[in-house]
């Protein structure tokens, strides 16, 4: 009888531990499309000696690396300085059957404008897109300590026509000297990338 109880106890322990041992990270295996805005002859916003296209690409590369570390399958719209149409960006995400679409940008405006904002569009996967935008925005503001300009709805092409939850993050204002100093820093770019991935993690953890 003692042996029987010991066997039952061991079986119970094994059943308790098995789900933990086998549990995968929620993001593991997900295909996440990372879109570095602009590129090539399209420099995007320009300010304080910086080009938006370069910042977008640098952050995108850090995001891609971090996603790989977490077992996701990141797909980048571009890995170098070349031009892609908006239609090509959306088509590539669809061709790769992406689970999420995250477009990375920096903003421009009057010199006093600063801060971070994240956009979604509600026509397709609206609630999931809003939730993803909220999670990424929250992580960006917390990590970067930027002014929180909020989560907003807009009809940017890439988030309107992508057939999966889609967001567009504006990391800061290239035309604001304080924001620009940070945006041009590799350390800050890495922090922004980590925050974006943490936002994606939060989205899948819910």
From Swiss-Prot:
This is Uncharacterized protein YqiI. It comes from the Bacteria. Keywords: Hydrolase. Belongs to the N-acetylmuramoyl-L-alanine amidase 3 family. Pfam families: Amidase_3 (PF01520). InterPro entries: MurNAc-LAA_cat, N-acetylmuramoyl_amidase_3. GO terms for molecular function: N-acetylmuramoyl-L-alanine amidase activity. GO terms for biological process: peptidoglycan catabolic process. Residues 32-201 form the MurNAc-LAA domain.
